Amino acid sequence: MGHFTEEDKATITSLWGKVNVEDAGGETLGRLLVVYPWTQRFFDSFGNLSSASAIMGNPKVKAHGKKVLTSLGDATKHLDDLKGTFAQLSELHCDKLHVDPENFKLLGNVLVTVLAIHFGKEFTPEVQASWQKMVTAVASALSSRYH
């Protein structure tokens, strides 16, 4: 698990306060499903995922993306205990949903891309480094049940 400096924590929480969770969540999950189409198999119940425009406009994708980012927002308040914060979600994704833990890394990388798009010049290399550390640590926490 990554160790977060006080600067990392400040950088993460400062940017997070400006994130529109609904928009960024839908875009992040939508992009994951478009860019990595094999991840769609976990979302059979979401209806039409036949094209990029269908995925990006799908209300179930948007709603679940918001749920995912809301959970990530909670994590920004518990950076020193991500494993504990995500224990139940790790169990759900491992035992019940059988999600490949590699997908958590992919989702984190897509989120970093979405943040870069949304925040432009404000998303400096230093901000990116803190967020990359965050999404890597979250992916590790979500994967903890698999080991």
From Swiss-Prot:
Q: Which UniProt keywords apply?
A: Acetylation, Heme, Iron, Metal-binding, Oxygen transport, Phosphoprotein, S-nitrosylation, Transport
Keyword tRNA-binding: yes or no?
A: no
Pfam families in the cross-refs: Globin
Q: What induces it?
A: By 5-azacytidine.
Residue spans crossing the bilayer? none
Query: What biological-process terms (Gene Ontology) are attached?
Result: carbon dioxide transport; cellular oxidant detoxification; hydrogen peroxide catabolic process; oxygen transport
Record text on subunit structure and interactions: Heterotetramer of two alpha chains and two gamma chains in fetal hemoglobin (Hb F). In the case of deletions affecting one or more of the alpha chains, the excess gamma chains form homotetramers that exhibit neither Bohr effect nor heme-heme cooperativity (hemoglobin Bart's).
Family, as annotated = Belongs to the globin family.
Q: Which PANTHER family match?
A: HEMOGLOBIN FAMILY MEMBER, HEMOGLOBIN SUBUNIT GAMMA-1
Q: Can you name this protein?
A: Hemoglobin subunit gamma-1
- Which species? Homo sapiens
Lineage, broadest ranks: Eukaryota, Metazoa, Chordata, Craniata, Vertebrata
